[in-house]
Amino acid sequence: MSSVAREWREIPGRYNLKGTKCENCGSIFFPARDFCPKCRRAGIRKVVPYNVCRTGKVYSFSVIHEAPDCNNAMKPYAVAMVQTDDGVLVSAQLVDVDLDKIEIGMPVRAVLRKLDADGASGVIHYGYKFVPNL
């Protein structure tokens, strides 16, 4: 079970694809980083908030046929690595698409959707998933 306070603290990254960008080398990171692993010491205090692009293309994907019991209702489902239009790789579930029609290079966009809930009367967790951008 998770806390409501923790959920609210994570909202920028979870709901809006908030990452960071190194002003020293220009690298973009998602999820956000506190320092640039490429620049190391030279990148300290040069990492700023960055809004990762919400559109991109499927870079790689997999269709999940066997899943944990908590995901039984949505089997089979697809997860994808999406390369956003600004070059960031984001892993997420791919929804609202026929599983047989998913292709590498397919244009997609991020949307806010329900991820899960802590029991029937618990906290509902929302986050990003990707849908076809037709």
Regions inferred by a protein language model and the residue ranges of each:
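Short functional micro-motifs and their immediate structural scaffolds
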Residues: 30, 44-48
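Short aromatic-glycine-enriched beta-strand elements
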Residues: 67-81, 125-127
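OB-fold/S1-family single-stranded nucleic acid-binding modules
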Residues: 113-134
